[in-house]
Every structure is written in structure tokens, then in C-alpha cells.
Curated annotation (Swiss-Prot):
Name under which the protein is recorded: Hydroxylamine reductase
Classification of source organism: Archaea, Methanobacteriati, Methanobacteriota, Methanomada group, Methanobacteria
The organism's place on the tree of life at top rank: Archaea
Locations listed in the record: Cytoplasm
Gene name of this polypeptide: hcp
Gene source species: Methanothermobacter thermautotrophicus (strain ATCC 29096 / DSM 1053 / JCM 10044 / NBRC 100330 / Delta H)
HAMAP family (alphabetical): Hydroxylam_reduct
Binding of [4Fe-4S] cluster, residues: C3, C6, C15, C21
Length: 427
């Protein structure tokens, strides 16, 4: 543990073995866990509020959750487990709210092929998660000759009719969040960071990068009120991009699209042509261990279907996995907040096959990087989903007591060797 939130803290530095107040190390770690989950919920709630959607019940939980971690309020480990599970439930509620906000505003996502590569002309690259910021940027760049490209978690924006209607939404440049320094250095474009997943910029593009909303970087101009005039002016000043050879990615598989295939999916499963579904995704990590997810998907047999979401998909979304009688073997469900689509899909499959969720031909292979993934993990645990795999490493705040609880109650398993894990899952 490491706690220094009150004046009693040991030597005025930190309590690292046991709190002077009596707080046990596991309680301290569970408090951290709750705060991480609350941070994740707050990110999704922020983006819903951008579009005018709020939830008083979620707001009230955030107040109670934060308050519970104050000094001398709650010393009960079991209560903090319950609060973490409640945080998972509140995160599901928040993701549903954000999904409604996105669909009400931009329409139901549709499968869409996205160009990956530059076109000739001045350019702006938008990174992060804010569809609202992207929409305002597209409005303000109409008729300017500027091509707007998405990066990382804004890729799914191309699937929304209300955003795809802008012809100058030109495609995608780069991949996951951690490639941005190379991507932004490579292209002479103006850059907009709209949310989390921005990195401290290199000097060679710092003067052409801007932030908005919650994002902020030292030495980078922050734009208030969605007024992107300085960003647009910078894009027009810079040398235009040259057209380059391009590839394509497919995104935009909303729940309704998948449910339209329900009868065919049931037929293929009952006929043994689809053996199992694998939900492989989450936050990507630059750790070498994250190569596991690439190898895992590459080694899956051809009678399996891969569902993916968030930036973890960049580990394998360029693979051509083909289809099984018209059902794509690789289905991109969207951003990390679109984990709600995965949750709803699990429930839909349970109804389709009249099975308990833990009896479904479905395995979940999670990758995590930061606090939003912690919120999503507790969302899945709140549904009593068992047998999930998690990587690239176990969360650092989970000590032996917490790991034992997760293993004993939910059969949560650290990723191992891809081939061995597949063999174990498929029997």
C-alpha cells in the first residue's frame, strides 16, 4: 500500500505496511481500485454530457464512491468489493447512456470500409474519443479543402451516418494511441487531441498540435468552446499531404447489425460451423507482452468468430479472417465505451441460445491499459461472467488477496501462451 492522504501518515511521507488509522493493505488497494473504476465511469459520463445526456443515479454513486475512500470512513474490505461491483453496474448504465447519446445524435453505426492512408491536400488528424469535437471540426472545415482524418479510438466514427455524411472525413491515419508520436511526425498535418490517450508531443509537431475539452498538454494551444479556427488556419499554412497507397479497415458493427444475422448465427452454431465466439479487445498496451493478442487471433481455427473493440483491435484488425457463410470472422464493435455493445450481445446470445451466459460458446480475452478498462472489468464481473482471461499483466494494485478473490469467485485467468490458452478453451 501507499497512502499519504492524512496528516497521520508515517514520517509525513506515507503508510506502506499498514495505516496508522488501522487501514489494512488490502483495503487500501481496494480503495485505489474503486477510484480507478470511478475515473473510468467519469470519462464515459463526460462524453455523454458533451451531447447533453446525464444520469442523476450515476452522479450520486460517484459522490458516494469518492466519499467512501475518505480517511476514517470505511475499513471494510467486503464493502469495497460490493462498491466495485456496483461501480461496474453504474459503468454499464453510463455506457448505455453514452451509446444512446451517440445513436440519437449520429445514427445507428453501420459496417463501413475506412481508407487507411493519406489523400492529397491539407489535413487535420483528430485523436481521442470525442465524437462531439469531431463533429464540430467537420462542420467548421466544410468547404475549406481540408481533409479530416481520424486516429486511434476515433476510427469507429466512420460508422456513424451523421459523421460519415461529411465527404472530407477522409479516412484513418495511424493505429493505436501509442503510435501517435511516429504518426504525427510523419504527416505534416495539424493535430487535434480531443480526450485521453494524448501523449507529450515531440518538438517537431508541438506547434501544430492543439487540444480541446478535457485534454491539455504543455506548450500546446488549448481551444475552448469548440472554436477550431486556429487549428484550421494552421492546417492551411502547412504543406499539403501527398496521396499514398492505402489499405482499408472495416468498422461500424452495431448491435442491430449483428442481431440482423441472429438466425444465420444460430444456424451456423447448431450446424457446428461456428464453434466459438471470442471477444478479444480492450485497451492496447505498448508492452511487448501485448503481442499475445496478435498471435492469439492468428492461431484461432477457422470455425471461430472474433469480436473486438477499443484500441486493442489494432493488434489484429488488419488481418483478413474471411467469413463463415456471410458472417464476418472479425467484427469491430467500436470504441472502448462500446463495450456496452459486447455486454448487450452477450445478453442477446444468451436469449438466442436459451443458455446461461457462462454456458455460451463465448470466451472473453481482455487487454487493459488504464482506468477505463478497470471500470469495464468490474462491469463484466457485475454480470457474474466467469472464466475471462486478462493481460498483458495483472493490475499492479491487485495484491494476493484481491487476485485470490477474483480467481476463486470468477475464475479470472492471466493470459499465458496463445496456443495453450486456445487449446484449454476449445478443449
Amino acid at each position: 500500500m501507499f497512502c499519504y492522504q492524512c496528516s497521520q501518515t508515517v514520517r509525513g511521507r506515507a503508510c506502506t505496511i499498514r495505516g496508522v488509522c488501522g487501514k489494512e493493505p488490502t483495503v487500501a488497494r481496494l480503495q485505489d481500485n474503486l477510484l480507478f473504476a470511478i475515473k473510468g465511469i467519469s470519462a464515459y459520463l463526460y462524453h455523454a454530457r458533451e451531447l447533453g445526456y446525464t444520469d442523476e443515479e450515476v452522479d450520486a454513486f460517484l459522490e458516494r464512491g469518492f466519499y467512501s475512500t475518505l480517511t476514517n470512513v470505511n475499513f471494510d474490505a467486503g464493502e469495497f468489493i460490493d462498491l466495485a461491483l456496483e461501480a461496474g453496474e453504474m459503468n454499464i448504465r453510463t455506457m448505455k447512456l453514452l451509446k444512446k447519446a451517440h445513436i440519437d445524435t449520429y445514427g445507428e453505426p453501420e459496417p463501413t470500409e475506412v481508407r487507411v492512408g493519406a489523400l492529397e491536400g491539407p489535413a487535420i488528424i483528430a485523436t481521442g474519443h470525442s465524437l462531439r469535437a469531431l463533429e464540430e471540426l467537420l462542420k467548421q472545415t466544410e468547404g475549406t479543402g481540408i481533409n479530416v482524418y481520424t486516429h486511434s479510438e476515433l476510427l469507429p466514427a466512420h460508422g456513424y451516418p451523421g459523421l460519415r455524411k461529411y465527404p472530407h472525413l477522409a479516412g484513418q491515419l495511424g493505429g493505436p494511441w501509442f503510435d501517435q508520436k511516429d504518426t504525427f511526425s510523419r504527416y505534416t498535418a495539424a493535430i487535434l487531441g480531443t480526450s485521453n490517450c494524448v501523449l507529450l508531443p515531440r518538438d517537431d509537431y508541438r506547434d501544430r498540435m492543439f487540444t480541446c475539452g478535457v485534454a491539455a498538454l504543455p506548450g500546446v494551444e488549448h481551444l475552448e468552446g469548440y472554436d477550431f479556427s486556429p487549428l484550421i488556419d494552421k492546417a492551411l499554412e502547412l504543406p499539403p499531404l501527398s496521396e499514398e497507397d492505402a489499405t482499408t479497415l472495416t468498422t461500424g458493427f452495431g448491435l442491430s447489425t449483428i442481431l440482423s444475422l441472429a438466425d444465420k448465427i444460430r444456424e451456423l452454431v447448431e450446424d457446428g460451423k461456428i464453434r466459438r465466439f471470442f471477444l478479444v479487445g480492450g485497451c492496447d498496451s505498448p508492452l511487448p507482452r501485448a503481442k499475445y493478442y496478435t498471435e492469439f487471433v492468428r492461431k484461432l481455427p477457422e470455425d471461430t468468430v472474433v469480436l473486438t473493440l477499443a484500441c486493442g483491435k489494432y493488434r489484429f484488425n488488419s488481418m483478413d479472417l474471411g467469413d463463415i457463410e456471410g458472417v464476418p470472422r472479425l467484427i469491430d464493435l467500436g470504441q472502448c465505451n462500446d463495450a456496452i455493445v459486447a455486454v448487450e450481445l452477450v445478453e442477446a446470445l444468451s436469449n438466442l441460445f436459451q443458455m446461461d451466459i457462462n454456458e455460451l460458446p463465448l470466451s472473453i480475452i481482455l487487454s487493459w491499459m488504464e482506468q477505463k478498462a478497470a471500470a469495464i472489468l468490474w462491469s463484466l464481473l457485475s454480470l457474474d461472467l466467469k472464466g475471462m482471461y486478462i493481460g498483458p499483466i495483472l493490475p499492479g494494485w491487485a495484491n494476493e488477496d484481491i487476485v485470490k478473490f477474483l480467481v476463486d469467485n470468477y475464475d479470472l485467468t492471466p493470459i499465458g501462451d496463445p496456443e495453450e490458452d486456445i487449446r484449454k478453451i476449445l478443449g
